[in-house]
Amino acid sequence: MQHTRRMLNPLLTGLRNLPARGATTTTAAAPAKVEKTVNTVTILGRVGADPQLRGSQEHPVVTFSVATHTNYKYENGDWAQRTDWHRVVVFKPNLRDTVLEYLKKGQRTMVQGKITYGEITDQQGNQKTSTSIIADDVLFFRDANN
């Protein structure tokens, strides 16, 4: 658990890895019970803006957003589309550099990783809950006309 906390600290200025949504943190020499858990997410969508390099020189991180859509059909036959925006962070050095150099706004991409929660303090001092996907892999797709 300490490794995860150290890894998330440099994410953004003001980002704190705090327990959220029922999460708890425990510290002990050995846990009372060891069991396997799974925190895996895969999204396929379009990049909202060119990736940005953030963090510090010692702890760089690349962030970008991905839009996914859900289509709905109403009883009257009309269609609606809901867009969800996902915040993606990349810590892995080689993946981070590749994403920063090659991934562009509007490009179709698939991200595999895990979900993490925390809080961000904005410039006015207000705290907001932050949900991010820590990328383990990012796949790039080219449009047929490119």
UniProtKB/Swiss-Prot annotation:
Presequence extent in this chain: 1-22
Annotated ranges, domain SSB: 38-142
SS bonds (residue pairs): none
GO MF annotation terms: enzyme activator activity; single-stranded DNA binding
SUPFAM superfamilies membership: Nucleic acid-binding proteins
Deleted gene: phenotype: RNAi-mediated knockdown in the testes results in a reduced number of paternal mitochondrial nucleoids at the nebenkern stage of spermatogenesis. However, the clearance of nucleoids at the elongation stage of spermatogenesis is unaffected.
Listed Gene3D superfamilies: Nucleic acid-binding proteins (2.40.50.140)
GO BP annotation list: DNA replication; DNA synthesis involved in DNA replication; DNA-templated DNA replication; mitochondrial DNA replication; mitochondrial genome maintenance; positive regulation of DNA-directed DNA polymerase activity; positive regulation of mitochondrial DNA replication
Subcellular location: Mitochondrion
Keywords: DNA replication, DNA-binding, Mitochondrion, Transit peptide
Record has DNA-binding as a keyword: yes
CDD domains for this protein: SSB_OBF
One GO cellular component term: mitochondrion
Tissue expression: Uniformly distributed in the early embryo. High levels detected in the anterior and posterior midgut primordia of stage 12 embryos. In larvae, high levels were detected in proliferating tissues including the CNS and digestive tract. In adults, highly expressed in the CNS, digestive tract and ovary.
Subunit structure: Homotetramer.
Role according to the record: Binds preferentially and cooperatively to pyrimidine rich single-stranded DNA (ss-DNA). Required to maintain the copy number of mitochondrial DNA (mtDNA) and plays crucial roles during mtDNA replication that stimulate activity of the gamma complex polymerase PolG1/tam at the replication fork. Promotes PolG1 activity largely by organizing the template DNA and eliminating secondary structures to favor ss-DNA conformations that facilitate PolG1 activity.
Full protein name: Single-stranded DNA-binding protein, mitochondrial
Taxonomic placement: Eukaryota, Metazoa, Ecdysozoa, Arthropoda, Hexapoda
Gene: mtSSB
